[in-house]
């Protein structure tokens, strides 16, 4: 129960006071992970990128899930973008939340100059599904 309350408080805090603003994702529809990263890089403001760099990967994911992540799910995944959805389905990723999580994780790692390790993300996802 203590963890549930902590989790809920984090969600409320990040949603209410988060620094990363949603960006306009309606203009272009990426077809794969590389294009997603390029479009996020192009559309995020420099101050947002600088802020993201101050966060841990988990902090970025928690803060962006209901902002940028929601935009990714609504505009790139759910609103008629068969190429991107097919890209993830071919990897065994079926849920929009999981798709946006991999895009966000990959973007964060790209921004920090880390290895994206998409295959590792897919492998971890498959292990989670097996449990």
Task: Give the role of each language-model region.
Residues 1-22:
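Bacterial Sec-dependent N-terminal signal peptides
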Residues 7, 36-40, 70-75:
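Short, functional N-terminal and low-complexity linear motifs
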Residues 20-62:
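N-terminal secretory signal peptides
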Residues 48-51, 55-131:
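Compact alpha-helical subdomains of small soluble proteins
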């Amino acid at each position: 129960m203590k963890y549930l309350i902590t989790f809920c408080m984090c969600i409320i805090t990040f949603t209410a006071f988060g620094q990363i603003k949603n960006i306009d994702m309606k203009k272009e529809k990426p077809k794969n992970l590389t294009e997603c990263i390029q479009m996020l890089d192009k559309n995020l403001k420099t101050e947002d990128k600088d802020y993201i760099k101050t966060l841990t990967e988990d902090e970025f994911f928690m803060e962006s899930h209901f902002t940028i992540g929601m935009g990714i799910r609504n505009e790139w995944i759910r609103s008629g973008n068969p190429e991107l959805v097919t890209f993830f389905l071919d990897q065994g990723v079926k849920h929009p939340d999981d798709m946006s999580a991999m895009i966000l994780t990959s973007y964060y790692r790209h921004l920090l100059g880390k290895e994206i390790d998409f295959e590792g993300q897919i492998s971890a996802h498959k292990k989670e599904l097996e449990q």
